Amino acid sequence: MSITGQPHVYKKDTIIRLKPLSLNSNNRSYVFSSSKGNIQNIINHLNNLNEIVGRSLLGIWRINSYFGLSKDPSESKSKNPSVFNTAKTIFKSGGVDYSSQLKEIKSLLEAQNTRIKNLENAIQSLDNKIQPEPLTKEEVKELKESINSIKEALKNIIG
């Protein structure tokens, strides 16, 4: 029996074998709703069904392999099944001990926090030294006069 005689899906130039649809019998009947019952219409319907089922199956495989629920037989980059891994085994599955890196990160964070505190204290001391300069009545009067002169000039321009 040829490989194409059994259920299969083509994906990336490889043939992926599927389990037979009915294990007990080879008699498969199909019902079609077409105006003509010729062989070409049946072939077209089968091709459409094959494409729909194949695309659905490939999508399900892609989702399952992305989440690590199953290993896609045609994807070399598919994740291995890791549904029952706990957080501890996920980090150790790479074979790298991250405790030394975590200690380094902790010391870097502590140093960064002290720098931030020093900067905040420096900013606070500078803010305390700055005193706002009070406006005099003369400056307010000059500002009013300049605004009024601008208004008059605009009235002359606009009309």
Curated annotation (Swiss-Prot):
InterPro entries: Caulimo_AT. It holds the Pfam family Cauli_AT. This protein is involved in virus transmission. Belongs to the caulimoviridae ORF II family. This is Aphid transmission protein.
